[in-house]
Swiss-Prot record:
Residues 403-489 form a coiled coil. Signal peptide: none annotated. Residues 43-112, 189-305 are annotated as: Disordered. The chain crosses the membrane at residues 126-148. This is MICOS complex subunit mic60. The lineage of its organism: Eukaryota, Fungi, Dikarya, Ascomycota, Pezizomycotina. It is a single-pass membrane protein.
Amino acid sequence: MLRTSLRSVRALGSRPSAAVAGRQWQATVVRRAAVSGQRFFADDKKPVVPEPSQPAVLPASETLTSPSTPPPASPQVEPTSTVPPETTPLTPPTPEATVIPPVAEEPVVPPTLPTPRKKKGFFRRLRNFFLSLTILGAIAFGGGVYYSRINDAFHDFFTEYIPYGEQAVLYLEELDFKKRFPDVVSRVTGRPRDSGEQVKVPAQSGASWRVASGGEPAGRQSSSIKKAGAAAQDAVPKSEPAVVAAAKEDTAELPKTEATTTATPAEPAPAPAATDASGTPVKKPFKAPEVDEPSRWPPASPIDPLTVNGATDPIVQDLVKMLNDVITVINHDNANEKYAPTICKAKNELSKVADKINEMKAKVEADAAKQVKARVDGFDKAANELVSRVESAMAAQEAAWRREFEEEITRLKKSYDEKVHLIQDREHQIAEEKLNNRLLEQAIQLQRQFTENIKKHVEQERDGRLGKLNELHKAVAELERLTSGLNEVVDTNLRTQQLHVAVDAVRASLEDAHHPRPFIKELVALKEIAADDPVVDAAIASINPTAYQRGIPTTAELIDRFRRVATEVRKASLLPEDAGVASHASSYVLSKLMFKKEGLAAGDDVESILTRTQTYLEEGDLDNAAREMNGLKGWAKTLSRDWLGEVRKVLEVQQALDVIQAEARLQSLRVE
């Protein structure tokens, strides 16, 4: 073929002529034969073209001196050697010893085709699948954790149904809290907690007002004074807690006795003996110094405890008790001379405070008495007005009933007269046709019946009038009884009216809201107005807390959300319980081919239930719509579970409001 010849010529022409001339003729012939023996396949099949009359001109072997290029020599004809025998190189090795294989044994090399793509192995595809699934799962889990911190509804779903979702969300929230408040943990752990235990400080702790003795006194009495002082110092610290405790007990009982007794001046206690039963040393009475002794000031008298007349207020009693405890401690420490002015000032101020409190109480009681008297006078005036109105209404009603009775008697008499005349005329006409005797007997019989009827009706009207008078008497007695309990009736009517208004306020809040809005304030007001009514409390307790904390959707929102839920339920209407990916795909495709029903379609299939539910929703019947959706099973019920929960919240709120309104009506009927 033409392409084969061109390739062979190119292969030969690609080498330099000097290298070709330097080789032996046999090697050249072998190479040419090998090149010409190779076959190549064309990419496209070409039609067979007849050989040209002139040989093809090769550009590689074309020269400028010759007009044409001679054709290549045939591989079968060996050219005549122009090299002299003397310069002929040595004979090369035989073809069997050469490395080049023989031309006849070389296989035909097919053309190089594009290598087909190697098919991936099963384990490699499985590895890629699990790797992709792991990456997508991690991305989805991270996105769910992030979105659950933004949306509360998705937070509840994610933490409840996704494994380890709650732990991840809590961990991120804890990190966020630590980042925002880094010093909270250190402050909580570093500061000691208040355990609530009371810390008591002894009365003799700290510095004292006494001046410490600087050294031993000089004189003959130094040894005896030293021994007596040492004995007193050893005995006082041991006996002080008992004395202070006894003093506190005495002052604790003081306000109780002072509240019932009049103020009496405190008498000084008699001087105790040198030592009591427990061995506690008691101070000796003051003795005037002798002539040869230095002068001494007598000790100050102890401070009297505080007594307040009419101290019935607990706060004043506590203040008196505290001040008496302080006075007892000061007297025990012999500091009465130092703190006497301050204690006297505190006594005066406390007495003034008690007097002011008593004056304020008296003023408040007087104002309250005036208000109560004004309220009682107002209620009496309203009761008298109501009685007068009731009496006038009763008189007007009695006159109206008497007038109606007389009119009714006249009308009955007239009607019966007309009836009698008509019967007489008919009897007269019949008498003309029949015998006179039969006509007379019939006339007598008719007159007798007429008389009996008249008497009967008269007696009935008389009994009816007496019965109405008895009923009127009973009504008057009932009005008198109601007038006596007017205060209770007014309060009950007011509370019932307020309960109606509160229920209407809750309904108006729910109906006017264009989106879910909390109604906690309305429920709190309704519960306060009910005043511990068990029925109202039970109705409010039956409402889901999320309903009045976040609000409930309106009917339009429920219908809009039902349309979206119905679309998803129709896609999963043909799914079995253990459906796979193929079942989901087939159910999605088949749901597009199903015909939609209208109205109250019969049947228990998903499409019929959805059609009936939509019809009930358009009619405003949420109860039947929820019952229809509750009848779904499998994936359809799972997809509609959230919508059913919202409808249940709305129905619970409506049912609770209906119960409260019925209770209010029942209270109104009881009052009536």
